């Protein structure tokens, strides 16, 4: 029963993070670094954001396998379930929220603040269950172990966040001709979420 409760709390955490993503998308002030690449790819391909999140997260798992090789545990494949669940919740919350957005720049800042709150709350929920890490965190840990063994985990996370954002920016200008989904919120979100965990 306790394990079932942990799964329910874990899924609730993913749902609230996804809800935060939906609010950040509607604010049009930029999504978090984790979701920046899936967002840009979704705009390029015209596919649902949730679908792109799932595919790219599975790509992160494949990179983990290449980096860790035999050190990659079969249990870590559970991240695939996380990828599908989170992708589903992203599409669900986008549907629930629709095109809702508070008017004006101040209203959009409020939307971004709500997004940050939901993301922080969701992360707290799923971390407390000590179940499956999301693929981006798994990739950070894998890179910390194999590529940057002398750096702290948070330093590797910053490197990875910056890398995916830069890739997203390049793809934006190459395929869209303008910057989309990467703005001030892309910087504010990780900083603010980290602060809420202090």
Per-region residue spans from a language model:
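C-terminal ends of transmembrane helices
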Residues: 60-71
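Cytoplasmic-side transmembrane-helix entry/capping segments in multi-pass membrane proteins
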Residues: 75-84, 106-108
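Conserved small/polar residues in nucleotide/adenosyl-binding loops
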Residues: 196-197
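Extracellular/periplasmic helix-loop-helix junctions in multi-pass membrane proteins
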Residues: 172-185
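Membrane-proximal helix-loop-helix units in multi-pass membrane proteins
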Residues: 96-145
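Short amphipathic alpha-helical coupling elements at transmembrane boundaries
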Residues: 36-46, 138-148
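Structural signature of hydrophobic alpha-helical transmembrane segments
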Residues: 45-56
């Amino acid at each position: 029963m306790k394990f079932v409760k942990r799964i329910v709390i874990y899924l609730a955490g993913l749902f609230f993070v996804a809800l935060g993503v939906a609010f950040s998308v509607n604010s049009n002030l930029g999504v978090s670094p984790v979701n920046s690449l899936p967002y840009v790819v979704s705009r390029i391909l015209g596919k649902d954001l949730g679908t792109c999140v799932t595919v790219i997260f599975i790509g992160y798992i494949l990179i983990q396998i290449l980096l860790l090789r035999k050190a990659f545990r079969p249990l870590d494949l559970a991240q695939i379930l996380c990828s599908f669940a989170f992708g589903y919740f992203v599409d669900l919350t986008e549907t629930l929220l629709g095109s809702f957005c508070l008017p004006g720049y101040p209203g959009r800042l409020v939307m971004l603040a709500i997004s940050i709150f939901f993301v922080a709350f969701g992360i707290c929920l799923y971390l407390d269950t000590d179940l499956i890490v999301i693929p981006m965190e798994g990739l950070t840990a894998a890179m910390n172990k194999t590529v940057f063994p002398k750096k702290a985990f948070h330093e590797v996370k910053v490197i990875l966040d910056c890398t995916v954002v830069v890739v997203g920016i390049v793809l934006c200008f190459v395929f869209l001709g303008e910057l989309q989904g990467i703005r001030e919120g892309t910087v504010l979100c990780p900083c603010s979420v980290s602060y809420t965990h202090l």
